[in-house]
Swiss-Prot record:
Main location: nucleus
Record's keyword terms, sorted: Nucleus, Ribosome biogenesis, rRNA processing
Annotated family: Belongs to the IPI1/TEX10 family.
Species per Swiss-Prot/TrEMBL record: Debaryomyces hansenii (strain ATCC 36239 / CBS 767 / BCRC 21394 / JCM 1990 / NBRC 0083 / IGC 2968)
Protein name: Pre-rRNA-processing protein IPI1
GO biological process, one term: ribosomal large subunit assembly
A cellular component annotation (GO) from this entry: nucleoplasm
Subcellular location: Nucleus
Length: 358
């Protein structure tokens, strides 16, 4: 009896179970259940990573949504979005890169209300984050120069408002890197000529009549900003306005300041180490403006001249821009009124430069 029972028990291991419809197959005896879920233990006081709060995440999402609306087809929506961003500027400096990347193209927006709101927003951003416009001046000045030569008269008339913001908040970066290009854009904006030949004068008159010259009110504002730009570029900063005076700092060596970090952004941009420029053809009409002095700059030299120091800016002004600017300012003074008054103030700046460089 015992042997039969043992044989029956051993035989059970080799018997194949019959499957029934609607019922799952029987699990083997050595089956291990792996359906459990491990629970994590969180200790907030001992965590290393600092998580952002829900309010910060919500604000970043809200800011990204409003920045996307800067490309809305309605000018009213674009203006309201700019006003909203100005009233809710973030305290996190890393968010300002996305803000400026989205709003700078609106410098050439078709709506005047949008451009006015953008001027206020740029000033607010520069006040909130000191040095912000210096970091993004390359893209900002690109759109400003484009606005100064735009085909739309309204965009040209409001272009110097943005230049005024740069003069107030990014003076050194503006005059050091973009002095020549800004003056050239000013000549285009005011329909002035750099040369006195008949071909250039007739071309300027034709261009001004076809695209429409600046209005009287706009010319007053343009000349006012031009005076501020020339004063900032051609005269040294006073000791009260200077951010850091190295002469009053005690150092190990009197020339230690030369080896410190530069106070300006991109101090070696003038060397053009990583820039490939296309060679330009010489223009015979421009060569007529070249002076007999070998050390004097000509219009052909302006593309390769670096205006990092004030002496170079003064020399460029005296050699190239002084004579045509005085000639055009005298014509504006003859008109009288507020335009003549602003032109006279610009001429005073140039006369002061001439008296100091004699």
């Amino acid at each position: 009896m015992g042997s039969k029972r043992k044989k029956a028990e051993k035989q059970k291991d080799f018997v194949k179970a019959k499957l029934r419809v609607g019922k799952t197959a029987a699990k083997p005896d050595n089956h291990t259940d792996t359906s459990f879920i491990a629970k994590s233990i969180s200790i907030p006081n001992q965590t290393i990573n600092k998580k952002t709060s829900n309010t910060e995440k919500k604000y970043e999402v809200d800011l990204a949504h409003h920045l996307s609306l800067t490309k809305h087809h309605s000018d009213v929506t674009r203006k309201e979005v700019l006003n909203y961003i100005e009233q809710h500027l973030p305290s996190n400096p890393s968010l300002y890169k996305d803000i400026l990347t989205s709003i700078v193209p609106l410098i050439i927006d078709q709506s005047q209300n949008v451009r006015n709101a953008l001027t206020s927003l740029l000033s607010a951003c520069a006040t909130q984050q000191v040095g912000l416009l210096d970091l993004h001046i390359r893209s900002i000045i690109l759109f400003i120069h484009s606005a100064m030569s735009h085909i739309k008269p309204d965009i040209r008339n409001s272009s110097t408002k943005f230049l005024s913001v740069l003069i107030d908040h990014a003076t050194e970066s503006l005059v050091r890197s973009y002095f020549i290009k800004t003056l050239k854009s000013y000549f285009t904006l005011l329909s002035w000529t750099l040369t006195n030949d008949k071909k250039a004068v007739s071309l300027a008159i034709t261009t001004s009549s076809s695209i429409g010259g600046p209005s009287k009110k706009a010319r007053i504002h343009h000349l006012s900003i031009l005076r501020a730009f020339l004063s900032a570029a051609l005269f040294p900063i006073s000791s009260n306005e200077r951010k850091l005076d190295y002469s009053k700092i005690k150092m190990i060596h009197p020339e230690s300041y030369k080896y410190l970090l530069a106070s300006s952004t991109q101090p070696f941009a003038s060397l053009k180490l990583f820039v490939q420029e296309v060679p330009k053809q010489k223009n015979t009409d421009i060569q007529q403006n070249t002076k007999k002095d070998d050390n004097a700059f000509s219009l052909n030299d302006l593309d390769t001249v670096s205006t990092e120091d004030i002496d170079t800016r003064r020399k460029v002004m005296l050699d190239v821009f002084m004579a045509p600017m005085l000639r055009n300012l005298k014509n504006l003074i003859k008109e009288g009124g507020e335009v003549g008054r602003e032109a006279h103030s610009c001429m005073k700046v140039l006369e002061q430069l001439q008296s100091e460089t004699k």
